[in-house]
């Protein structure tokens, strides 16, 4: 990267985009973020934004070179490095990712006939999107590269995930764009490190990166589903202890202990979506997605097993806390929260269910479930 080029643009500064912007600003870059939500932008401008994502409010209050705009032309013209971080949800009914917002952004860039820029897609896309659709949508942009650079982060720990990643995945449009992206991430690495030790970057084709992103997440979902399956087997086997069994399995260096714990089914905005998306993509290229279909089935089956176990306890009141989609997550994300789905099934079975959680999470639950449960706000 041209070491004198210090400006970076981010199109879409939602939860992930804002965290990226803050880390880039802390690494020494001048960052301009774009969004369409005027009120949200104003809170960022006056640094009054309240975020449940750890460290965001603190880093925002200390930032000096982060600005935001709702002027699309301004953010595009601000730099030659344009990151795009917009939602690509699964479109429902086991269909593919909804690339509508991303498509619209690329269409707008093409209508401006941008040139001499690097466009970097951060949001998750289906394999083949970059070169089959993305490049077509930017066909009028001269000397402009299209790159894929998905983040491997966890909601509720995004800043830490960006500052201390297991790896940086770069699906480079050209060697030059790959080098510039590597330079940018190395500056982020230096925020918490004095040398290059531990800096792991994987540069490859966009197609390889698209598959890698899904493959990593889906390996984790399979490991979680397998762990719960083994745990359920132990529960049905007198004399066995699921925690001892899983701990021993994790000692094998070929397997490792991460994500090898008994608990609730996996949920959230990414894991279920990516598992289904990889299965759907497999079918389009003629490979039967046996593993991903089985993982999804095991995950749902485990939820049903746990529900029956709770139901058989026949409690007077069923109390649940920590209702976000994963354990110890203070961010109000309840999408496909297994614990919440079990609570709903218990309530539907006529059981009294009390939800104890923080106000922000309870407010989110009430939006979807109303008075299905009784609630108690806790710290």
Question: Predicted regions: what is each one?
Answer:
Residues 2-379:
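Structural/interface elements that position substrates and couple domains in central-metabolism enzymes
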